[in-house]
């Protein structure tokens, strides 16, 4: 008979219920911590525990998540920032650890350099969904290894000498790109599970539609309704709770530059949906279907669409109401606009139409179906206001919020921060210091130097250059390959080895950096202290660098 224990419990329902209630109380105690003071969970501790198995597993992700939260709490409270960049591989993560307190793993970089299918491509999230978790695991295993290696090295030195040795924190928390979640809610949960198992401290997820996902700095972005993205955030938190992890969830919105919306089902989106205000036009898709039936294609179809859009006078309903008031003979136009705005704010389009009808005495023509795309998407009035509207809705379900933007626009970043903090004053913000921006034309160098600090004062406590790993690798690779092709080994000496030695970069002794000494010590431990095949024994060429 199997033993009666936690991993193979008694079939006695009383014992089963007792174990269940103890675990439920433990979860409730966990959730009462100040860490969760801003977090809304639309599920119960009982529901979470009932989804767990009997074998408790302590994930390293939880330790790293607690560490990340502590970093961001401190930075936010002091209006400071943790800033980092996208890491490509283990060499890079060990060098970043010396100077930066977090690490970023980019979906864009993974798509181009580390797809699980080995097929590179642009940032469309069309790679296997194991891709970014695998890169997290790759880097986290390297972090663990170099942490072990350093500890062994330090403990091999007399105590009185250790104070002069570097003691690098290699275990910098990793934040990774979850794209749109790669599918429905169960896909989001499985992806979250993978990230936790691989060692991620936090993940971010964006409010684009999965089938049309684009890099944040590409055109053609389609947003999902607000509630659909909230459901994704809830799915992340639920999966992390099931696994007992404090994993941070960062909500990204692409609303600033998005032009399309998958559906108008959520009334919180209604104020930003564009409609035709020209009652004489047929619906756009009817025209496009008729044109295709006559053999038109390509540029001809684009011309038909462009001409229709020019005539449609696309507008949000609120702007259409304002235009109708301006065109009318009302004595107090400003007062009517103000009353409409105060009464219609946050209302559905149906309710806003009723307010407008009451104030203007008539219905306003506004058709948001007429301009829909051939895929069925609604036209959207994106921008900072749209992003703030979404961020406020996401705030109770995430740990930080990021608005993707077209430019490094400080005034816009300030507007977004003020909009969010007017409702959620403690909400942490994240910012993409993107290499897609032309920093030279965006601002002078002295402003570039202070940009991170200025953003931090607004509450952007975590900032990152998504693709700096890619670009720095490309730059040195181009420089070295070009020089090597003309001056041979002089290029390696001048561009690589001598600067490594001058700047005391540990990788100059690449055998030691790779852990050869550590592995020798493992081997000696097993063989009683003697090994004739030690990698770092007499004859190792690295002695030239003493």
UniProtKB/Swiss-Prot annotation:
Its EC number is 4.1.3.1, 4.1.3.30. Signal peptide: none annotated. PROSITE patterns: ISOCITRATE_LYASE (PS00161). Transmembrane segments: none annotated. GO terms for molecular function: isocitrate lyase activity; metal ion binding; methylisocitrate lyase activity. The keyword Metal-binding applies. It is found in: Glyoxysome. Substrate binds at residues 106-108, 216-217, 252, 432-436, 466. GO terms for cellular component: glyoxysome. Its cofactor is Mg(2+). InterPro entries: Isocitrate_lyase, Isocitrate_lyase_ph_CS, Pyrv/PenolPyrv_kinase-like_dom, Pyrv_kinase-like_dom_sf. One of its GO terms (biological process) is tricarboxylic acid cycle. SUPFAM superfamilies: Phosphoenolpyruvate/pyruvate domain (SSF51621). Pathway: Carbohydrate metabolism; glyoxylate cycle; (S)-malate from isocitrate: step 1/2. The active site is at residue 215. Gene3D superfamilies: 1.10.10.850, Phosphoenolpyruvate-binding domains (3.20.20.60). Keywords: Glyoxylate bypass, Glyoxysome, Lyase, Magnesium, Metal-binding, Peroxisome, Tricarboxylic acid cycle. It is an enzyme of class 4 (lyase). It holds the Pfam family ICL. The keyword rRNA-binding does not apply. It comes from the Eukaryota. It catalyses: D-threo-isocitrate = glyoxylate + succinate; (2S,3R)-3-hydroxybutane-1,2,3-tricarboxylate = pyruvate + succinate. Homotetramer. Catalyzes the formation of succinate and glyoxylate from isocitrate, a key step of the glyoxylate cycle, which operates as an anaplerotic route for replenishing the tricarboxylic acid cycle. Required for growth on ethanol or acetate, but dispensable when fermentable carbon sources are available. Also acts on 2-methylisocitrate. This is Isocitrate lyase. It comes from Gibberella zeae (strain ATCC MYA-4620 / CBS 123657 / FGSC 9075 / NRRL 31084 / PH-1) (Wheat head blight fungus).
């Amino acid at each position: 008979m199997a033993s009666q224990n936690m991993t193979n419990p008694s079939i006695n329902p009383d014992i089963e219920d007792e174990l269940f209630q103890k675990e439920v109380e433990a979860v409730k105690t966990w959730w009462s911590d100040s860490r969760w003071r801003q977090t809304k969970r639309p599920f119960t501790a009982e529901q979470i525990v009932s989804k767990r198995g009997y074998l408790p597993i302590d994930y390293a992700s939880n330790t790293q998540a607690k560490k990340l939260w502590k970093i961001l709490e401190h930075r936010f409270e002091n209006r400071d920032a943790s800033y980092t960049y996208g890491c490509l591989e283990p060499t890079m993560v060990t060098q970043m650890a010396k100077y930066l307190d977090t690490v970023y793993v980019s979906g864009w970089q993974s798509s181009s350099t580390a797809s699980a299918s080995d097929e590179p491509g642009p940032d469309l999230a069309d790679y296997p969904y194991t891709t970014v978790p695998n890169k997290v695991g790759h880097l986290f295993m390297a972090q663990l290894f170099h942490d072990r290696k350093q500890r062994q090295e330090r403990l091999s030195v007399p105590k009185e000498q250790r104070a002069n040795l570097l003691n690098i924190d290699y275990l910098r928390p990793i934040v990774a790109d979850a794209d749109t979640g790669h599918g429905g809610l169960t896909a989001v949960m499985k992806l979250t599970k993978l990230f936790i198992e691989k060692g991620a401290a936090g993940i971010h997820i964006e409010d684009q539609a999965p089938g049309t996902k684009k890099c944040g700095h590409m055109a053609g972005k389609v947003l999902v309704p607000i509630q659909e993205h909230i459901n994704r955030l809830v799915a992340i938190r639920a999966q992390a709770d099931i696994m007992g992890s404090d994993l941070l969830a960062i909500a990204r919105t692409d609303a600033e530059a998005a032009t399309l919306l998958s559906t108008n089902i959520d009334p919180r989106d209604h104020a930003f949906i564009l409609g035709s205000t020209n009652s004489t036009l047929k619906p756009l898709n009817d025209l496009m279907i008729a044109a295709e039936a006559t053999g038109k294609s390509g540029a001809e179809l684009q011309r038909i669409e462009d001409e229709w859009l020019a005539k449609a006078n696309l507008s949000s309903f609120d702007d259409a109401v304002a235009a109708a008031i301006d065109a009318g003979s009302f004595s107090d136009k400003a007062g009517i606009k103000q009353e409409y705005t105060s009464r219609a704010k946050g209302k559905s389009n149906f309710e806003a139409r009723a307010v407008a009808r009451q104030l203007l005495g008539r219905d306003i023509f506004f058709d948001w179906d007429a301009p829909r795309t051939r895929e069925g998407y609604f036209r959207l009035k994106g921008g900072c206001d749209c992003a703030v509207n979404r961020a406020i809705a996401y705030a109770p379900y995430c740990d930080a919020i990021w608005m993707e933007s077209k430019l490094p626009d400080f005034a816009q970043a300030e507007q977004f921060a003020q909009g969010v903090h007017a409702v959620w004053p403690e909400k942490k913000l994240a910012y993409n210091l993107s290499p897609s921006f032309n920093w030279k034309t965006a601002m002078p160098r002295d402003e570039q130097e202070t940009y991170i600090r200025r953003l931090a004062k607004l509450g952007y406590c975590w900032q990152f250059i998504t693709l700096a790993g890619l670009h720095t690798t490309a730059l040195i690779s181009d420089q070295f390959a070009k020089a090597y092709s003309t001056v041979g080994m002089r290029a390696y000496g001048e561009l690589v080895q001598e600067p490594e030695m001058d700047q005391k970069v540990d990788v100059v002794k690449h055998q030691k950096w790779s852990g050869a000494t550590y592995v020798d010590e493992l081997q000696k431990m097993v063989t009683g202290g003697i090994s004739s095949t030690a990698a770092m024994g007499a004859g190792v060429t690295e002695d030239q660098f003493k």
